[in-house]
Amino acid sequence: MPQLDTSTWFITIISSMITLFILFQLKVSSQTFPLAPSPKSLTTMKVKTPWELKWTKIYLPHSLPQQ
């Protein structure tokens, strides 16, 4: 049975990889990509919730007077 000649495999694989890389670069460079989105200034309206309209004081245990 004859032995398989692998002496040309290296140059074949390298040249096909280079060819695929060049074709991919040409394909990507021909595409048109959209521009980066411009930032939009958003003005948020502060909505008062019912618990913010009422004044409440929370007494912590440390702030209570000594008994």
UniProtKB/Swiss-Prot annotation:
Keywords: Acetylation, ATP synthesis, CF(0), Hydrogen ion transport, Ion transport, Membrane, Mitochondrion, Transmembrane, Transmembrane helix, Transport
Spans through the membrane: 8-24
Recorded GO CC terms: mitochondrial membrane; mitochondrion; proton-transporting ATP synthase complex
Annotated compartments: Mitochondrion membrane
Span of the signal peptide: none
Residue positions where N6-acetyllysine is found in the record: 54, 57
UniProt keyword annotation of Membrane present: yes
GO biological processes: proton motive force-driven ATP synthesis
Modified residues (N6-succinyllysine): 54
Membrane topology: Single-pass membrane protein
Quaternary context: Component of the ATP synthase complex composed at least of ATP5F1A/subunit alpha, ATP5F1B/subunit beta, ATP5MC1/subunit c (homooctomer), MT-ATP6/subunit a, MT-ATP8/subunit 8, ATP5ME/subunit e, ATP5MF/subunit f, ATP5MG/subunit g, ATP5MK/subunit k, ATP5MJ/subunit j, ATP5F1C/subunit gamma, ATP5F1D/subunit delta, ATP5F1E/subunit epsilon, ATP5PF/subunit F6, ATP5PB/subunit b, ATP5PD/subunit d, ATP5PO/subunit OSCP.
Family assignment from sequence similarity: Belongs to the ATPase protein 8 family.
Function: Subunit 8, of the mitochondrial membrane ATP synthase complex (F(1)F(0) ATP synthase or Complex V) that produces ATP from ADP in the presence of a proton gradient across the membrane which is generated by electron transport complexes of the respiratory chain. ATP synthase complex consist of a soluble F(1) head domain - the catalytic core - and a membrane F(1) domain - the membrane proton channel. These two domains are linked by a central stalk rotating inside the F(1) region and a stationary peripheral stalk.
Name of the protein described by the UniProt record: ATP synthase F(0) complex subunit 8
Gene (name only): Mtatp8
